[in-house]
Curated annotation (Swiss-Prot):
Gene: hmgA
Binding site residues for Fe cation: 340, 346, 376
Matches recorded under InterPro entries: HgmA_C (IPR046451), HgmA_N (IPR046452), Homogentis_dOase (IPR005708), Homogentis_dOase_bac (IPR022950), RmlC-like_jellyroll (IPR014710), RmlC_Cupin_sf (IPR011051)
Naturally occurring in which organism (per UniProt): Streptomyces coelicolor (strain ATCC BAA-471 / A3(2) / M145)
Identification of the protein by name: Homogentisate 1,2-dioxygenase
Gene Ontology annotations of biological process type: L-phenylalanine catabolic process; tyrosine catabolic process
Tree of life domain: Bacteria
Function: Involved in the catabolism of homogentisate (2,5-dihydroxyphenylacetate or 2,5-OH-PhAc), a central intermediate in the degradation of phenylalanine and tyrosine. Catalyzes the oxidative ring cleavage of the aromatic ring of homogentisate to yield maleylacetoacetate.
UniProt key word Oxidoreductase: yes
Keyword Iron among UniProt keywords: yes
Length: 441
């Protein structure tokens, strides 16, 4: 929460481009030339590969990075089990999947020394982390920066801040994420979260499946939606235990459980690296929104930022979708999102402002769940207003909402099903939608 941390965050340099083969060194000469693993790595460093995909996956989908570090990752004592807190992992078999429409207020304020890991609270998910399928929806509310270091062997983490800035110290370098940004931490990458404000709150999609990638654009063409160049990767920065002595607690999430070990050095000691299995930060306001300039509301797939493909083409394990500022100009068109029943399951969150399909009740930091084939759509107030509105060009710029959309039903954790901040009577927003049918004869 110090001014120095914010100054550091706001002055960071980045590398540009999602999926690029990046290279960075914090000390000149730390990267070897012409090979990955020389007999003696430069500057007395250790060469180590971090693989995010199998060696033999197609080159277009292969993810790996080479790290040149002060000590190898293997130099640590045994891990021991620790408590999982409010973190839960698929398979979610402690509850029956619920077809009801559900909505939550923001998480309650936690205690004064709650860091990012302790502040993670699992709402639900699907699949099986041990089979590398499915996803989980988490929320977080933290009041303290992390002293320890965290990594997730179960999946990659898409962090969506809603309140409070974050300085993410990763093995690859530093990332700055504010509300309106997202940060993507690949599977297995170690990191520490430092708060830039009094507290921090937001959402996390834990993706157990194939790594997130940019969606295909099809007839849209070569440009549009989330442009690859707007994803920013860190430049190399390292911690050296000679300047930061003392043990470091490392927390590893593995097959749904948290394990801890006490290192005698910081694992964030990578002096140089190259590869494409790297963390990113992305400003959602740079999303190039595609929409109709004639009539009708297009399907929400046009708002896809990132997708985790499944074994069925076009059917995602999970999509990350953003409803960014945009113009609505459709003629003779009901402009809010239409009434819908969907084979996919949708968890929605709100980063700021209001969502154009809900007049009230859907608040920043809260969320809603519409499982597969659960009917949903605009509430009565929104329907009445949009049905009678003058159809002049309308700018939607007072809200930033997002969606985690997944092919499987989202099963709630018991803590989410019984939460005090679960809103009662969410179904009431669709009550009072009157009969308007008048037969011609």
């Amino acid at each position: 929460m110090s001014g120095d941390a914010r100054k550091t965050a706001e002055g960071l340099a980045y590398l540009s481009g999602f999926g690029n083969e990046h290279a960075s060194e914090a000390v000149a000469g730390a990267l070897p030339e012409g090979r990955n693993s020389p007999q003696r790595a430069p500057l007395g460093l250790y060469a180590e590969q971090l693989s995010g995909t199998a060696f033999t996956e197609p080159r277009a989908h292969n993810r790996r990075s080479w790290l040149y570090r002060i000590r190898p990752s293997a130099a640590h004592p045994a891990f021991t089990r620790s408590g999982n807190g409010t973190i839960r992992t698929a398979p979610f078999n402690q509850a029956v999947p619920d077809p009801n429409r559900l909505r939550w207020n923001p998480l309650p304020v936690p205690g004064p020394a709650t860091d990012f890991v302790e502040g993670l609270w699992t709402l639900g998910g699907n699949g099986d982390a041990t089979q590398r399928t499915g996803m989980a929806v988490h929320l977080y509310h933290a009041t303290a920066s992390m002293d320890r270091v965290f990594s997730d062997a179960d999946g990659e983490l898409l962090i969506v801040p809603e309140r409070g800035g974050l300085l993410l110290r990763t093995e690859f370098g530093l990332l700055h994420a504010e509300p309106g940004h997202v940060a993507l931490i690949p599977r297995g990458v170690r990191f520490r979260v430092q708060l830039l404000d009094e507290d921090a709150r937001g959402y996390v999609c834990e993706n157990y499946g194939a790594p997130f990638q940019l969606p295909d654009l099809g007839p849209i063409g070569a440009n549009g939606l989330a442009n690859a160049r707007d994803f920013r990767a860190p430049v190399a920065a390292y911690e050296d235990d000679e300047s930061t002595p003392g043990p470091v607690e490392v927390v590893n999430k593995f097959c749904g459980n948290l394990w801890t070990a006490e290192y005698d050095h910081s694992p964030l000691d990578v002096v140089a690296w190259h590869g494409n299995h790297v963390p990113y930060v992305y400003d959602l306001r740079r999303f190039n929104v595609i929409g109709s300039i004639s009539y009708d509301h297009p399907d929400p797939s046009i708002f896809t930022v990132l997708t985790s493909p499944s074994d069925t083409p076009g059917l995602a394990g999970v999509d990350f979708v953003v409803f960014a500022p945009r113009w609505l100009v459709g003629e003779d068109t009901f402009r809010p999102p239409y009434f819908h029943r969907n084979v996919m399951s949708e968890y929605m969150g709100l980063i700021e402002g209001a969502y154009d399909a809900k007049a009230e009740g859907f608040v920043p930091g809260g969320g809603s769940l519409h499982n597969m084939m659960s009917a949903h759509g605009p509430d009565r107030e929104t329907f009445d207003r949009a049905s009678a509105a003058e159809l002049k060009p309308q700018r939607i710029d007072d809200g930033l909402a997002f969606m985690f959309e997944t092919r499987w039903p989202v099963t709630l954790t018991p803590q989410a099903a019984r939460a005090e901040h679960l809103q009662p009577g969410y179904d009431d927003v669709w009550q009072g939608l009157e009969r308007h049918f008048r037969p011609l004869h």
